[in-house]
């Protein structure tokens, strides 16, 4: 974290630097004009994590500033949502005078939504007993007078929930409301409004598609749910169990009837498609019945392994969302042999950082 860079007055200049940098990285590829999707300049981040510093009777949130090589007190945090910033002082005011709740508390995590829900996770270097549980329930009741809040207590091999360990986000995507179950301690897109822009871009680039869609690394179904409208059927894979459970929840609450989620890794699915191995998790699913002309991938920072790249090359159209331009470039070296980039986008998910979220749409040459 570099607090000095978090200046709304310099946001446009920083975004322009990212645009230039991304275009320069892609100079070896024939790309169309870069579409740039900006972020709000403040209060854009829907989740935040803070360490807690104890100083006598005082206690406060802090982060580590790499530029200063020191901890920095954070009574407020410009990137965090307005809801998180409202909760921060209210929560500290409750914790400070309460010995049971503050003792050995070392971290607080917040997960908020654009729809007004907030989840607070209190992390401890001690086991949580019945007395702590009683105080935590009272804390929730007091905060609930002002906030739509739930609380989690975490310690080694302990997780106590009052009353939910998830939030339900509501996003307006092209004028339609989509709801997403987001569970504590699992991946969700941090920048809610930029996430909407990413969904709308993905819907736009696939709007004239035919047949079915295959998605690898689908998470909680973030893109699958939104893209289901453009395809006859959607088949999606995800390895993390909490994300798969959230995806199934999201299918139900959004009343999607053409989306099937499979819990398996992209690598295993690649083997299944190549008929190298059989998997019990695929029983009852006829992969050959799918007519997938389009594939959507949003891989981890490491990008796709060579076998998955080869699998992806077998599809007419590829939508690739990347959180790491360098591994995207590595994958595009192979993908560009068979496909041409016809759409190219930069999504500013993480303002005031060097991080660049990008998207490419490729079509077979």
UniProtKB/Swiss-Prot annotation:
Protein keywords: Methyltransferase, S-adenosyl-L-methionine, Transferase, tRNA processing
Residues bound to S-adenosyl-L-methionine: 189, 217, 222, 238, 298
InterPro entries, sorted: MeTrfase_TrmA_AS, MeTrfase_TrmA_CS, SAM-dependent_MTases_sf, TrmA_MeTrfase, U5_MeTrfase_fam
GO molecular function per UniProt: rRNA binding; tRNA (uracil(54)-C5)-methyltransferase activity, S-adenosyl methionine-dependent; tRNA binding
Gene Ontology biological process terms, A to Z: tRNA methylation
Keyword Manganese: no
One term under GO cellular component: cytosol
Superkingdom of this protein's organism: Bacteria
Record keyword Protein transport present: no
Active site: 323 (nucleophile), 357 (proton acceptor)
EC number: 2.1.1.-, 2.1.1.35
Gene3D superfamilies: 2.40.50.1070, Vaccinia Virus protein VP39
Reaction equation(s) it catalyzes: uridine(54) in tRNA + S-adenosyl-L-methionine = 5-methyluridine(54) in tRNA + S-adenosyl-L-homocysteine + H(+); uridine(341) in tmRNA + S-adenosyl-L-methionine = 5-methyluridine(341) in tmRNA + S-adenosyl-L-homocysteine + H(+)
HAMAP family: RNA_methyltr_TrmA (MF_01011)
Similarity comment: family membership: Belongs to the class I-like SAM-binding methyltransferase superfamily. RNA M5U methyltransferase family. TrmA subfamily.
Function summary: Dual-specificity methyltransferase that catalyzes the formation of 5-methyluridine at position 54 (m5U54) in all tRNAs, and that of position 341 (m5U341) in tmRNA (transfer-mRNA).
Protein name: tRNA/tmRNA (uracil-C(5))-methyltransferase
Biological classification of the source: Bacteria, Pseudomonadati, Pseudomonadota, Gammaproteobacteria, Alteromonadales
């Amino acid at each position: 974290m570099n607090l000095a860079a978090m200046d709304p007055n310099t946001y446009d200049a920083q975004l322009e630097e990212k645009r230039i940098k991304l275009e320069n990285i892609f100079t070896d590829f024939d790309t169309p004009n870069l579409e740039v999707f900006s972020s709000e300049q403040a209060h854009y981040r829907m989740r935040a994590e803070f360490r807690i510093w104890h100083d006598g009777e005082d206690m406060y949130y802090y982060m580590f500033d790499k530029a200063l090589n020191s901890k920095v007190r954070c009574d407020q945090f410009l990137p965090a949502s307005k809801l998180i910033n409202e909760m921060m002082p209210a929560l500290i005011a409750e914790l400070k005078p309460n010995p049971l709740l503050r003792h050995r508390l070392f971290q607080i995590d917040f997960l908020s939504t654009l729809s007004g829900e907030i989840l607070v996770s209190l992390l401890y270097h001690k086991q949580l007993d019945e007395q702590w549980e009683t105080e935590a329930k009272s804390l929730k009741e007091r905060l609930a007078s002002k906030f739509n809040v739930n609380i989690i207590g975490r310690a080694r091999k302990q997780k106590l929930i009052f009353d939910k360990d998830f939030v339900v986000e509501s996003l307006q995507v092209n004028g339609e409301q989509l709801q997403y179950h987001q569970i504590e301690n699992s991946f969700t897109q941090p920048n809610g409004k930029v996430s909407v822009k990413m969904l709308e871009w993905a819907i736009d680039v696939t709007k004239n598609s035919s047949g079915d869609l295959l998605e690898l690394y689908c998470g909680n179904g973030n893109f699958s749910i939104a893209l289901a409208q453009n395809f006859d059927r959607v088949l999606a894979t995800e390895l993390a169990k909490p994300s798969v459970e959230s995806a199934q929840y999201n299918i139900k609450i959004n009343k999607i009837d053409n989306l099937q989620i499979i819990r398996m890794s992209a690598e295993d699915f690649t083997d299944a498609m190549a008929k190298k191995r059989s998997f019990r998790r695929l029983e009852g699913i006829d992969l050959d019945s799918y007519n997938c002309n389009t594939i959507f991938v949003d891989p981890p920072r490491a990008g796709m392994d060579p076998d998955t790249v080869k699998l992806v090359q077998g599809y007419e159209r590829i939508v690739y969302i990347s959180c790491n331009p360098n591994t995207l470039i590595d994958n595009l070296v192979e993908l560009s042999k068979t496909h041409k980039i016809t759409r190219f986008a930069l999504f500013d998910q993480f303002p005031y950082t060097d991080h660049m979220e990008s998207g490419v749409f490729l079509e077979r040459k």
